[in-house]
Curated annotation (Swiss-Prot):
Required for maturation of urease via the functional incorporation of the urease nickel metallocenter. Keywords: Chaperone, Cytoplasm, Nickel insertion. One of its GO terms (cellular component) is cytoplasm. Its main location: cytoplasm. UreD, UreF and UreG form a complex that acts as a GTP-hydrolysis-dependent molecular chaperone, activating the urease apoprotein by helping to assemble the nickel containing metallocenter of UreC. The UreE protein probably delivers the nickel. Disulfide bonds: none annotated. It comes from the Bacteria. The gene is ureF. It comes from Cereibacter sphaeroides (strain KD131 / KCTC 12085). The lineage of its organism: Bacteria, Pseudomonadati, Pseudomonadota, Alphaproteobacteria, Rhodobacterales. Pfam families: UreF. Belongs to the UreF family. Gene3D superfamilies: Urease accessory protein UreF. This is Urease accessory protein UreF.
């Protein structure tokens, strides 16, 4: 395994201080309303977000950031794609924490930007295949949502890992497609996930930020 790949794995690890564990992407509301109630429904909900929501849009943004597209233009697009105030906060807060930590580790100047753009800027010099970077990012995103489901549904640890493993083919497919997608192919249709994120903003009792 190359040093570059090890760096990327470290940056996308749950131990990396982006605070990802505190964000459920609206999943907490879906669980509280009974839409997600077991491993099968959790897997379907996460699969929809990956294929039709932030998973795909972030993957396309990341691919273009890796290829040196104007980071400010990508950051503006990432903000515009956030369907709710909490989703915007989720990508901006994690992106800022990610950039600050990588900058401290590497000495590079990495301004705070939405997470997929910040990750793309940081990872571009690693020279890794674009689809590989996208797949690892999508896996980290899915793993964080599975972890939220394990804690809040709750699911057993083995159930959670089985759900994550079942998402691997979809992650590979989205990564391969997004690596070649033009920027104007970006778009979202994960309507239930977006509504969940909006309704989470007024949820009275909650343990996640989003």
């Amino acid at each position: 395994m190359s040093a570059a790949l090890l760096s990327l794995v470290q940056w996308l690890s749950p131990a990396f201080p982006t605070g990802a564990f505190a964000y459920s992407h609206g999943l907490e509301w879906a669980i509280s309303e009974g839409e997600v109630r077991d491993a099968a429904s959790a897997r379907r909900w996460i699969a929809d977000v990956l294929a039709f929501g932030a998973g795909r849009t972030d993957a396309i943004l990341l691919a273009h950031a890796l290829r040196g597209h104007d980071p400010e233009a990508l950051a503006d697009l990432a903000r515009a794609l956030a369907p709710s105030a909490e989703r915007l906060r989720e990508t901006e807060e994690q992106g800022a924490a990610f950039a600050a930590t990588v900058a401290a580790l590497t000495g590079r100047d990495l301004p705070p930007r939405p997470l997929p753009v910040a990750l793309g800027q940081a990872a571009a010099p690693l020279g890794l295949p674009v689809a590989e970077v996208l797949a690892l990012m999508l896996h980290a995103f899915a793993a964080n949502l599975v972890s939220a489901a394990v804690r809040f549904v709750p699911l057993g640890q083995t159930e959670g890992q089985a759900a994550l493993a079942a998402l691997h083919p979809l992650i590979e497919e989205i990564a391969a497609e997004s690596a070649e997608a033009p920027l104007d192919a970006i778009g979202s249709a994960a309507l239930r996930g977006d509504l969940a994120a909006m309704r989470h903003e007024t949820q009275e009792v909650r343990i996640f930020k989003t």
